[in-house]
Design a protein with these regions (language model features):
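Substrate-positioning beta->alpha
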Residues: 140, 166-171, 187-209, 215-219
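Catalytic helix-loop patch of NAD(P)-dependent Rossmann-fold dehydrogenases
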Residues: 116-160, 165, 181
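Amphipathic terminal alpha-helices
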Residues: 289-323
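Terminal hydrophobic/aromatic helix or amphipathic segment near a protein terminus
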Residues: 236-284
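Substrate-binding strand-loop-helix patch
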Residues: 163-165, 190-200, 218-238, 247-258, ...
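NAD(P)H-binding glycine-rich loop region in Rossmannoid oxidoreductase-like domains
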Residues: 37, 47-85, 89, 93-97, ...
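N-terminal Rossmann NAD(P)H-binding glycine-rich loop of SDR-like oxidoreductase domains
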Residues: 3-23
Length: 323
């Protein structure tokens, strides 16, 4: 089976290629923006923008579209270019190459609301309002894929962590080191979240590539929701990092984040705001996924969430020499 993967120089894409490079039944080809990479030499890697994808001399059986902007902050134009237009370019490539199976790596952020949500199913109502431009752009990309005439499916994974991650744990741990974390206090229902290790997500991407009859969409997670504040506290204790001292109510934090976003957007200021409304929502409200379809078609996850967390923490200790 020939698999073409976009976003090959990114966190998830590079992990997928390294994870399955020794599979004799797979021929892996990756497309990424970076000219330099640390991928195994047996991976056919092309440093190519997706607008030039038609120049690629490959006829894949499966295309996994994992490229895109994952940062929680950016302009609508940034997300349109990186998440919507790139999907359109990948679809055009697939049409030119005989309609291979297409797997879009979307996000559970399409469901996000400033409210508690439990066991969200794939057919849940989405939009018209979104908590982030990121979630909005991912849903726009999904709409394009739904119109593709070949085999296709959409993955909506939860938050992903692991070696190479720069968006989930690193910013939190960096803020904790500086004593900048704030605890968001919800007195009624504690925030919960689904998280999963990157290797587990990659396993499910490969299972989807091989599965005979795909559904239109799958929620993807480890199936072990965590209480967000308690989980973060446990991680910080294991790394001997300070726990949050200051507390804010979600409504106050949302107002602060909204003001900061306005300042960053209209002044404009460099970089990202220290907090965003999307981030406040993640740590203030419960958001868990129903993964019945994933389990029925692809089976249970290999490994456990707890062991994956411990593996990541050991990697973090090694990289930061914190113990």
């Amino acid at each position: 089976m020939k698999i073409l993967l976009t976003g090959a120089s990114g966190f998830i894409g590079s992990t997928f290629l390294r994870r399955f490079v020794d599979r004799a039944d797979l021929e892996l080809c990756g497309v990424g923006r970076r000219t330099e990479n640390d991928l195994p030499p047996t991976v056919r890697y092309h440093a190519l923008s997706l607008e030039r994808l038609a120049e690629l001399d490959v006829m894949p059986d499966v295309v996994i579209h994992a490229a895109g902007r994952t940062s929680p902050w950016g302009t609508p134009q940034d997300y349109e270019r990186d998440n919507v237009e790139t999907t359109r370019q990948v679809i055009d490539f697939c049409i030119q190459r005989g309609f291979p199976r297409l797997i879009l790596l979307s996000s559970s952020a399409v469901y996000a609301r400033f409210a508690h949500q439990f066991n969200v199913r794939e057919n849940a109502e989405i939009g018209p309002q979104f908590t982030s431009e990121y979630g909005h752009s991912k849903y726009q990309a999904e709409t394009l894929v739904k119109a593709y005439c070949g085999e296709k499916t959409i993955f909506r994974p939860c938050a992903v962590f692991g070696e190479g991650d720069r968006l989930l744990f690193p910013p939190l741990l960096s803020a904790a080191k500086k004593g900048q974390l704030v605890r968001l206090r919800n007195d009624v229902t504690p925030a919960q979240a689904d998280i999963m290790p990157v290797g587990m997500l990659c396993d499910y991407l490969l299972r989807a590539a091989c599965y005979p009859q795909l559904r239109s969409c799958y929620n993807i997670s480890a199936g072990q929701p965590v209480e967000t504040a308690a989980f973060l506290d446990d991680v910080l204790r294991q790394l001997d990092l300070p726990l949050p001292v200051k507390t804010l109510r979600p409504c106050t934090a949302l107002r602060v984040a909204g003001t900061l976003e306005w300042l960053w957007r209209w002044l404009p200021l460099a970089g990202e705001p220290p907090i965003t409304r999307f981030g406040v929502g993640v740590f203030s409200y419960a958001a868990t996924l129903d993964i019945t379809a994933m389990r029925e078609d692809f089976g249970a996850p290999d490994g456990t969430l707890s062991q994956s967390v411990q593996d990541f923490l050991q990697h973090y200790r090694t990289m930061n020499a914190c113990c």
